[in-house]
Amino acid sequence: MTTVEADAPDYVLQRINHAIFQNVEMLQSNIEAVTGHIRKKLEEKGEADVERKVLHFIPTAEGKTYWYDGENYWRIMTFIPRAKTYETVNPEYSYYAGTAFGNFQAMLADIPDTLGETIPDFHNMEFRLKQLRDAVAADAAGRVQEVRYFLDEIEKRADEMCKAERLFREGKLPKR
């Protein structure tokens, strides 16, 4: 949404897919916790242009960062000027994306363990591997043999892929 005044910010109006994110209140609570934590870290470091580096959601009159119109959930955030998207990624952009993701993870390393699970088992690799193995066994589309090499590679790495879940169960890794 583009504002009329030249010096006023523009906005992004986004419909939240509540078929996927069924607990919209928890989703937004998580986003508020993450963006608030990152904003505080950047401000403490004296970072310039924090508004370009952290999403800012516009609250409703009731103070919520989403609106339900009776059918759909919506949220509005300020548009980040000069932001870009790329259809094709080259190694240089991949490097920058990896660096940004690493910085994001580092800033969240000490976030309190209060985030809710908005999609159950989404990051549970043991669960995802079981889903994959069930799909391979069913071979509903008849294409398993075409991708056997990739499936074998996944199986070779399965134990390592499940390490985080094991460490969490053993109390050696916080759930984040």
Question: What do the predicted segments below correspond to?
Answer:
Residues 35, 98-99, 126-127:
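Charge-rich, low-complexity amphipathic helices
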Residues 34-37, 107, 157:
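Generic, well-ordered alpha-helical scaffold segments in large soluble proteins
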Residues 7-29, 39-115:
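ATP-binding pocket architecture of kinase catalytic cores
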